């Protein structure tokens, strides 16, 4: 079993070997998986008691996901700006508002010059920063990152880790990163 308390605004890394349950933990916190036993409370809400509809709302507004594989984060036929807008289609009707927010998020992650680039025109690190902007699109309280630096070189890895620290400090967002190193 596991007993874990993560405070609001905390930056935390869960480190362990492959198969140790790191991604499963992240998926449970994200409302994507349910355990066979136990309890999980996020912001005072019992995730395991939520209906499917409540879980959808939780995932839309409480958590943002960054996956290791960029293919899970980005649509290849859309620009960075368009990709970041995708999660907003369900909540923001005004196209100008979506575009402005997406642009601002891309600037926040250091990609002002890549707003009109397609994923195939970006490096792995740039794609991962677009993925972080996507995860922030609906102002989540918690940012969940599953091996976010697993597919990039060490210099880019350091830059992405610094970005998570910056977002944690500037936005006060809780950041949970799982990694094997």
Locate each region found by the language model.
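Conserved ABC transporter NBD signature motif
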Residues: 38-46
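Conserved catalytic motifs of ABC-family nucleotide-binding domains
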Residues: 139
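The feature captures the beta-strand-to-loop junction immediately N-terminal to the Walker
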Residues: 15-17
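Conserved ABC ATPase signature
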Residues: 118-122, 126-128
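Short coil-to-helix segment of the ABC ATPase nucleotide-binding domain corresponding to the Q-loop/switch region
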Residues: 77-85
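Helix-to-loop junction immediately C-terminal to a conserved catalytic motif
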Residues: 30
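Catalytic Walker B motif of ABC-type/P-loop ATPase nucleotide-binding domains
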Residues: 143-146
